[in-house]
Curated annotation (Swiss-Prot):
This is 3-hydroxyacyl-[acyl-carrier-protein] dehydratase FabZ. The gene is fabZ. One of its GO terms (biological process) is fatty acid biosynthetic process. The lineage of its organism: Bacteria, Pseudomonadati, Campylobacterota, Epsilonproteobacteria, Nautiliales. Keywords: Cytoplasm, Lipid A biosynthesis, Lipid biosynthesis, Lipid metabolism, Lyase. Its main location: cytoplasm. The active site is at H48.
Length: 148
């Protein structure tokens, strides 16, 4: 549905901090499914952990937040999307975060987010991350669309 070039038109993040490779499904105002291919060549693996590389949980949460940002922007009206060029999504809070299984280089990390609540510029999302259909992380995320 959206490749990395299209995602970069929405999100301000760039390598090495753009953590969404592709959006595969999006239902405006409701949900998004996206993924990241985790590669051993990512800088984070230089120190986390040498000889036993594990993708950091905070990076999984950030990837979910980025997928949620795409959902928030694309759920806006065309007029709001045009105005959104001067806006950015700020992460406000993380609640109920749990890390269930490790993510390793070579894994396809899938993000599934559903809208719990949306009021004005504030979004509350239920985020889950999977590898091979197994839950690896989950959290409730709150974000706000603000002026740059």
């Amino acid at each position: 549905m959206l490749d990395v070039v299209e995602i970069q038109k929405i999100l301000p993040h760039r390598y090495p901090f753009l953590l969404v490779d592709r959006v595969v499904e999006l239902e405006k105002g409701k949900s998004v499914k996206a993924y990241k291919n985790v590669s051993i060549s990512e800088p984070v693996f230089e120190g986390h952990f040498p000889g036993h590389p594990i993708y950091p949980g905070v990076m999984i949460i950030e990837g979910m937040a980025q997928a949620g940002g795409v959902l928030a922007f694309l759920s806006s009206s065309e007029e709001e999307q045009e105005a959104a060029k001067d806006k950015v999504v700020y992460f406000m809070s993380i609640d109920k975060a749990k890390f269930r299984n490790p993510v390793r280089p070579g894994d396809k990390l899938e993000y599934h987010l559903e809208v719990i609540k949306h009021r004005g510029s504030i979004w509350v999302l239920d985020g889950k991350a999977y590898v091979d259909g197994n839950l690896v992380a989950e959290a409730e995320l709150k974000a706000m669309i603000v002026d740059k």
